[in-house]
Amino acid sequence: MIYGVPKGVMEFAMRSSTNILATPDNLKRWKKVNNDNCKMCYKPNTHPHKATLFHILNHCESFLGENERMKWRHDSVLNFMTLTLKENKPSHIQVYADLEDHKSNNATIPHHIIVTSSRPDIVIVDSSSTPPTVYLFELTICFERVGNMEAANQKKYNRYSSLTQDIKENGYNCKNIPFEVGSRGHLTLENRSRLTIIHKLCSPNLNFTNFWKNICKTSLLCSYAIYLSRNDPWTGAPHLLPVKVKPVEQL
């Protein structure tokens, strides 16, 4: 359960969990409207998509662009994690992320480790081990339904498996750890365990429960914003933060 959110957000969370929000497919089922097609991604002479909650929060093509709302949600979660980790990390840990001001020469893996066009979302380098250990973390915001998170995890693991091997061949330890957060704020036990790895590396003195709950809260708040703007163009927005986090200057 996520606490400390406005009443409207909590109502959204509860109604979305039982699929009783006023989405077009539900409105048609309740005989309130005759058409349940998504008007945001409809194109003439194409098969229309039904505007379900899954479609609105995770699947609408018009919401998937570089400056669109789903990227904003993903990067808001990533931004909160990055700022929190950098603020609390020990000196032997370096944190890079696929965000402005948190890269190393426009890369998330420093070039002295490997030169690659791949940019995992979060890269943590632990220089306390011999050889140093490189952790590749890739975030996916998934709709919570059977099989979704498992499929996303396997897909991202496969994406970075060859890169992991290349880094090992360059003389480093390397771990490939994709993880998923639910678009409605849910976190599975498996993903909580994956976040434990990040937490122990960077912020062992930070309350872990608060850490993962604020990650989930960020996803939920962003999804509520996406739901509220489901019929409107997206004009962009700064990253959403669930709590005040001190900005960290990139060294």
Specify the residue positions occupied by each region the protein language model found.
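Short Cys/His-based metal-binding microdomains
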Residues: 31-84
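Short beta-strand-loop-alpha-helix junction that forms the active-site gateway
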Residues: 133, 138-155, 181-183
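Helix/loop segments that flank and initiate small ligand/metal-binding modules
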Residues: 1-50
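Domain-level recognition of nuclease-like catalytic cores that cleave nucleotide substrates
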Residues: 174-251
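Conserved, non-catalytic sequence blocks in retroelement Pol enzymes and Pol-derived host proteins
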Residues: 3-6, 26-31, 66-71, 146-152
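Active-site metal-binding core of divalent-cation-utilizing nuclease and nuclease-like domains
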Residues: 28-37, 84-139
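Conserved, well-structured core segments
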Residues: 11-14, 39, 122-125, 135-141, ...
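Metal-dependent nuclease catalytic cores in nucleic-acid-processing enzymes
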Residues: 85, 156-171
